[in-house]
Amino acid sequence: MKKIKKAIIPAAGLGTRFLPATKAMPKEMLPILDKPTIQYIIEEAARAGIEDIIIVTGRHKRAIEDHFDSQKELEMVLKEKGKSELLEKVQYSTELANIFYVRQKEQKGLGHAISSARQFIGNEPFAVLLGDDIVESEVPAVKQLIDVYEETGHSVIGVQEVPEADTHRYGIIDPLTKNGRQYEVKKFVEKPAQGTAPSNLAIMGRYVLTPEIFDYLKTQKEGAGNEIQLTDAIERMNNDNQVYAYDFEGERYDVGEKLGFVKTTIEYALKDDSMREELTRFIKELGL
């Protein structure tokens, strides 16, 4: 069985929920404290043993490439000024993994974005990490899925429970059997209508997929939003070859919409020793 050493991170979206900030700046580069959100995702992949990452980009995404590239002039200035801690942080972002880029030529959905990286992946199993979800966990969320793949040899989809009122916002699984946190899946449903979801187990931005998924994506018809939906292709693959779901452990932060982004920033700031005390005082002074 081949080891999971490659990952895809889709980053071609327009970031419309954050306009006008994302008119010229990629949404993935918006910072939680002093790091862009996409760096948290790449750090998770690196901790899970991923060596090669391909980021699927679109127009106006050059800042992502620049961030993970070395900038010798900046490093020299930091070194000359004795700012060794900042220098280490700047260099760290360039050393996380081997990072490659491919452009998604059309905005045709997540499934289409994954297809854009087919040549890079080849005939290997791979991980997918979506940038809207930062997960804090002792064992990286995607590593938990990799462990299930290595045990079963099958594709594994990361899920977590959501309130029933929110199920229409996600891809949802209809579980067939349960073994601890692991599920065999009867059916995958992309964004079911309110009140029709078969469970409250939602697909949460982490996948380990076998290369066969590309064959299903190649023939996948447009689904929700007139886009090529990855969930629809996974559902078809599941009919032929069992796909598992795994309720991964960890605290998930939704940075794909404004309120979640603000909440995440506050929580991360409160975990930071350098600002916790003053921020706590400020929040109390608001008297909310």
Swiss-Prot record:
InterPro entries, sorted: GalU_uridylyltTrfase_bac/arc, NTP_transferase_dom, Nucleotide-diphossugar_trans
Enzyme class, spelled out: transferase
Question: Among its keywords, does the record have rRNA-binding?
Answer: no
> What Enzyme Commission number(s) does the record list for this chain?
2.7.7.9
Q: Keywords on this record?
A: Carbohydrate metabolism, Nucleotidyltransferase, Transferase
Q: In which pathway does it act?
A: Glycolipid metabolism; diglucosyl-diacylglycerol biosynthesis
Segment forming the signal sequence: none
Q: Which domain of life is it from?
A: Bacteria
A GO molecular function annotation here is: UTP:glucose-1-phosphate uridylyltransferase activity
Task: Give me the reactions it catalyses.
Answer: alpha-D-glucose 1-phosphate + UTP + H(+) = UDP-alpha-D-glucose + diphosphate
Annotated GO biological processes are:
enterobacterial common antigen biosynthetic process; UDP-alpha-D-glucose metabolic process
The cross-references to Gene3D superfamilies, in alphabetical order and at most eight, read: Spore Coat Polysaccharide Biosynthesis Protein SpsA, Chain A
Function according to Swiss-Prot or TrEMBL: Catalyzes the formation of UDP-glucose from glucose-1-phosphate and UTP. This is an intermediate step in the biosynthesis of diglucosyl-diacylglycerol (Glc2-DAG), i.e. the predominant glycolipid found in the S.aureus membrane, which is also used as a membrane anchor for lipoteichoic acid (LTA).
Record-stated family: Belongs to the UDPGP type 2 family.
Protein name in the entry: UTP--glucose-1-phosphate uridylyltransferase
Q: Which organism is it from?
A: Staphylococcus aureus (strain MRSA252)
State the gene name recorded for this protein.
gtaB
